[in-house]
């Protein structure tokens, strides 16, 4: 047998031996021969699928030990830990009360279920001591108030809209006390801040002030004659007449009080027993050029021994007990003269005194004034109330508006051709070009019925055919309108109700004679550049004058056409026969379509500041260009009467 063959046989035997040994190990291993799996299925109480809570790892170890012939160390599974939810941590069982613990502990998330549990941390309640720092509070004086430092300049309140508020004058920091101005306007009027004592008086009477550089005046005694009793009164120097001085029981003259011995030297003490001075011979005065200044008002003249006392104009003083009192007769009472009551001005209203505040303005409710306000109240004029005939006071009406403002006083409205925005068509007027144009509306139907002319802040002149028969409460007047249905105009319009409507007494609906009506407004108009009154003239239009009329047109008023602009057209005077007019009307032909203008609008003639109202649009013959229109002439006498009844000045007619 060769060596190579022997090696092959030996390798084959070794291979078979290895395979036999491996087969024996397979049959003996429970994990490879299926005994482990079959044992788990046979013990259902330890099966994880049947009873998941059983510790299957320990049983697996026992089965594995029984299946193996070797006795090795028993297999133990890893210890189970509890994983806490977010916000919890592991603590001992005794430290967790009702699911919370309050002690600071290390944060552990995996808990040993035998000794620890998951618990939520809740900090213990802490008692915080609140310390409040007291804010400094100052008490302001009676003439000061508490304001911010920005509103105080040089020690005085400088706020423009400052109003004195009633209440305690306590001023917390950082505010400061600042002096109130001399007068402060409040809702009740002016409050005058005066010192409590304008002229403070001394609490105890004292001697007159004497200069500190000279000794007090004392007469030079010559003969010591004891008086009957001690006196401490001041004795004036002797005069040439030598009147006897007696004690006068009066408290009006200041009484001399000697100084205390502790504060003044012994040489300046006044003896208690003052001798009566003896008259001295009068030496002849020699002329001298020496200037002697006059004594001050509160100064006692200096006594000079070498100067003789001068004659005095002072009258001798006598005792009051020795004099008879003069007979006093009572002042005779004047005869009962009837009190004159004045008539209040146009801006004032006669009302009860308790309805006037401290500055004389009418109040809707009774006013109670303090003693200080009543002492410095604005003087009021006596008047007689027309309602009940009782006395009253003239008080200013806060709602009064002057009929002619300052910028319009005595000035008639003018035609403004250079205003903007401008019209679109040739017959369109610019904004505020015709400032006296008004519009008459009916409230119940919300319709536009006609036009009008503003002749005062509370009066509009229109056509009687337009407003005759309508309820006063159903009429509204709009001033300052230009574009219908628009609110984007440079200045707003003004809408007000109507108080009365006065139709001309000679108005005839059949002939349209005196087709005029005066509308009195409930509220006064506020004049502006687009709202102004026109002056009136009763003269007929002339051929040389430039006349024109205005309005929005019949169609625009009937349908309230949105965006319709005010129209204006020139007119030419015509004969009265062209429009069948009488003496109360005039006729004029329009350049543009006569139906593009409104009944009640003004026929204005002139230019610049001489524009006058000479007619009110009463009606047209037909629509079209060049058609004749009838205008009612203004009756100035009747209009002035209506103005006079309402206490208005007669300023309508201009010459």
Curated annotation (Swiss-Prot):
Q: What is the stated purpose of this protein?
A: Inactive serine protease that plays a role in germ-band retraction and dorsal closure morphogenesis in embryogenesis; contributes to amnioserosa attachment and epithelial apico-basal polarity by regulating the localization of laminin LanA on the apical side of the amnioserosa epithelium. Contributes to epithelial morphogenesis probably by regulating the bsk/JNK pathway, as part of a negative-feedback loop, and by modulating the cross-talk between the Egfr, bsk/JNK and dpp signal transduction pathways.
Q: Does the keyword field hold Transport?
A: no
Classification lineage: Eukaryota, Metazoa, Ecdysozoa, Arthropoda, Hexapoda
Q: Which gene encodes it?
A: scaf
The record's Gene Ontology cellular component field reads:
cytoplasm; extracellular region; extracellular space
Looking up InterPro entries in the UniProt record yields: CLIP_SPH_Scar, Peptidase_S1_PA, Peptidase_S1_PA_chymotrypsin, Peptidase_S1A, Trypsin_dom
SMART domains given in the database record:
Tryp_SPc
Q: Which residues, if any, are the signal sequence?
A: 1-24
Q: Where is the composition biased (Polar residues)?
A: 213-225, 237-252
Gene3D superfamilies named among the record's database cross-references: Trypsin-like serine proteases (2.40.10.10)
Which organism encodes this protein? Answer: Drosophila melanogaster
**Region of interest called CLIP, as start-end residue ranges on this chain:** 343-407
Q: What is this protein called?
A: Inactive serine protease scarface
List, alphabetically, the Pfam families matched. CLIP_SPH_Scar, Trypsin
Disordered: annotated segments: 213-319
Where does it primarily localize? secreted
Keywords, comma-separated and alphabetical:
Developmental protein, Disulfide bond, Secreted, Serine protease homolog, Signal
Domain (Peptidase S1): give its ranges. Answer: 421-644
Per the record, what phenotype accompanies loss of this gene's function? Embryonic lethal due to defects in the dorsal closure and germ-band retraction; these defects include undifferentiated or defective larval cuticles presenting dorsal holes and wrinkles, defective attachment of the amnioserosa to the tail end of the germ band, defective elongation of the lateral ectoderm with compromised interface between the LE cells and the amnioserosa. RNAi-mediated knockdown results in pupal lethality and scarring.
Question: What is the disulfide pattern of this chain?
Answer: 344-394, 350-383, 356-395, 450-466, 547-605, 579-587, 595-623
Gene Ontology biological process terms, A to Z: dorsal closure; dorsal closure, elongation of leading edge cells; establishment or maintenance of epithelial cell apical/basal polarity; germ-band shortening; imaginal disc morphogenesis; imaginal disc-derived male genitalia morphogenesis; innate immune response; notum morphogenesis
Relay the domain remarks.
The CLIP domain consists of 37-55 residues which are 'knitted' together usually by 3 conserved disulfide bonds forming a clip-like compact structure.
